[in-house]
């Protein structure tokens, strides 16, 4: 009997994807370039139909036609290496799916190369981490629709489910799937940083104990902030260190890593003039965190504001922080979906924004209840320029802006850094400013570089001799 699908790359994510497929009734062939990971996976089996192969040719020959091969290998050169090894063994009509965090431009290059050989190629964004890979992730496939249809029965089967809906939908051509995952990760960066800043306010400004802060996050997770990241934050704050008995959060070094997808999101936005400021600021916050030694030295040298004895009403300010966090998250998601929309128009992808919001509701790291509202907004207004002007969010932001302004101002007056909350407020105020100060910038550009300018009262392009 032939296997219905093959998985190459048996690290944590690849092994769990293979087990997920096998648990859903698929006959799965698995292959890894080093046999130790293959052997480790086989030891985990509990009756699933999963067959190990130690030679790539045997692996390929075990697959039913058209062959479907799922790659879960490290992004970059390893993906190219695997594809080069596979090409001589595959036939026209076979399908390769890349489920790693590949850059969408690499995916487009590989798509073109394989298209010439008649081999289908899907760039498949996957979100959910190792648990999601096993139990059901959010899946974002991009490539030719007819190629997707060959793989869809398996992809929809292993995806997370929300009600009767699988968290998998055809995203668009070529690199659209990996692009969608890339921006998803940018939103994730911003969401995480905003939550960290809310935590900082509760702990440093209101000086609340960790258990109380955890309870606050648990309460927030019962309302409109309900999301995976809010849920795990409460759990993190309650976790004790086995070695010291102290809260684990207090013994974790405050230096944040990153794997590159957030940077890719920011770079793509910058290259195309898209103001994804909160996403980019969250990346810079990680970079600043990595300067631990410099920060430790600077705290003894750089002065902040004089400490003042303040008596902030706890319940009032907890609500301000909740409002600030919600508004910051809305602004971050608005930027991410604006980046989807503007890039979709730029590349001619026709991204299904309402469906993207729906598949983010389950399995993925940024799953949140208000994604239903985002989907409804794009369903009602498919050409919506920005989520900030969707009626539901317009009303919310009007009501919650006081909370965000209070929190940001308190941070400024006390010298506590809230980079993403501050940037969210600047973005909100900048987006609602009908006439900005960019006229002065354009005049400056024309003064020193003769870059010309447009006028508000007549058509055309103008230059002034400013020294006369």
Curated annotation (Swiss-Prot):
Supply one GO CC term from the record.
Answer: cytosol
Q: Does the keyword NAD apply?
A: yes
Q: GO MF terms on file? A: NADP binding; phosphogluconate dehydrogenase (decarboxylating) activity
Residues that bind NAD(+): 9-14, 32-34, 73-75, 101
Q: Name one GO biological process term.
A: pentose-phosphate shunt, oxidative branch
Q: Pfam families annotated for this entry? A: 6PGD, NAD_binding_2
Per the record, what phenotype accompanies loss of this gene's function? Answer: Cells lacking this gene exhibit no detectable phenotype on glucose as the sole carbon source, and they grow normally on gluconate.
Q: Does the keyword NAD apply?
A: yes
Q: Report the active site residues.
A: 181, 188
Catalytic activity, as annotated: 6-phospho-D-gluconate + NAD(+) = D-ribulose 5-phosphate + CO2 + NADH
Q: Where does this protein hold substrate? A: 101, 127-129, 184-185, 189, 259, 286, 445, 451
Instruction: Give its E.C. classification number.
Output: 1.1.1.343
Source organism, top-level taxon:
Bacteria
Subunit organization: Homodimer.
Similarity-based family: Belongs to the 6-phosphogluconate dehydrogenase family.
User: What is this protein's function?
Assistant: Catalyzes the oxidative decarboxylation of 6-phosphogluconate to ribulose 5-phosphate and CO(2), with concomitant reduction of NAD to NADH. Does not contribute to oxidative pentose phosphate (PP) pathway fluxes during growth on glucose. The functional role of GntZ remains obscure.
- Stated name of the protein: 6-phosphogluconate dehydrogenase, NAD(+)-dependent, decarboxylating
Q: Which organism is it from?
A: Bacillus subtilis (strain 168)
């Amino acid at each position: 009997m032939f296997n219905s699908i093959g998985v190459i790359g048996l690290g944590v994510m690849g092994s769990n994807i293979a087990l997920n497929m096998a648990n859903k009734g698929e006959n799965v062939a698995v292959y890894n370039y080093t046999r130790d990971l293959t052997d480790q996976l086989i030891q985990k089996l509990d009756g699933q139909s999963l067959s190990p192969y130690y030679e790539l040719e045997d692996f390929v020959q075990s697959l039913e036609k058209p062959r479907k091969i799922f790659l879960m290998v490290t992004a970059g050169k390893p993906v190219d290496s695997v594809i080069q090894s596979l090409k001589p063994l595959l036939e026209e009509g076979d399908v390769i799916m890349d489920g790693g965090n590949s850059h969408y431009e690499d995916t487009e290059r590989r798509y073109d190369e394989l298209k010439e050989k008649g081999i289908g190629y899907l760039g498949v964004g996957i979100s959910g981490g190792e648990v999601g890979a096993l139990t059901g992730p959010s899946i974002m496939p991009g490539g030719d629709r007819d190629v997707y249809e060959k793989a869809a029965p398996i992809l929809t089967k292993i995806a997370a489910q929300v009600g009767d809906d699988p968290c998998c939908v055809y995203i668009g051509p070529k690199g659209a799937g990996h692009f969608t995952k890339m921006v998803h990760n940018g939103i994730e960066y911003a969401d995480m940083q905003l939550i960290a800043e809310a935590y900082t306010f509760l702990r440093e400004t209101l000086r609340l104990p960790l258990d109380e802060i955890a309870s606050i996050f648990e309460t927030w997770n019962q309302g409109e902030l309900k999301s995976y990241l809010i849920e795990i934050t409460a759990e993190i704050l309650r976790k004790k260190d086995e070695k010291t008995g102290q809260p684990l959060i207090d013994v974790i070094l405050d230096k944040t890593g990153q794997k590159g997808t957030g940077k890719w999101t920011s770079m793509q936005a910058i290259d195309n003039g898209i103001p994804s400021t909160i996403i980019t600021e969250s990346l810079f916050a990680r970079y600043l965190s990595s300067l631990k030694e410099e920060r430790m030295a600077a705290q003894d040298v750089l002065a902040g504001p004089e400490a003042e004895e303040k008596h902030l009403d706890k319940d009032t300010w907890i609500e301000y922080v909740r409002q600030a966090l919600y508004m910051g998250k809305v602004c971050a998601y608005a930027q991410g979906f604006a980046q989807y929309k503007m890039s979709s128009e730029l590349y001619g992808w026709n991204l299904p924004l309402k469906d993207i919001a729906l598949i983010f509701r389950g399995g993925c790291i940024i799953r949140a209840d208000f994604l239903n509202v985002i989907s409804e907004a794009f369903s009602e207004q498919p050409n919506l320029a920005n989520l900030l002007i969707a009626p539901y969010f317009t009303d919310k932001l009007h009501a919650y802006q006081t909370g965000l302004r209070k929190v940001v101002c308190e941070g400024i007056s006390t010298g506590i850094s809230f980079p993403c909350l501050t940037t969210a407020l600047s973005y909100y105020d900048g987006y609602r400013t009908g006439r900005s100060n960019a006229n002065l910038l354009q005049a400056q550009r024309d003064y020193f570089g003769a870059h010309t300018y447009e006028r508000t009262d007549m058509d055309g392009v103008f230059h002034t001799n400013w020294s006369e």
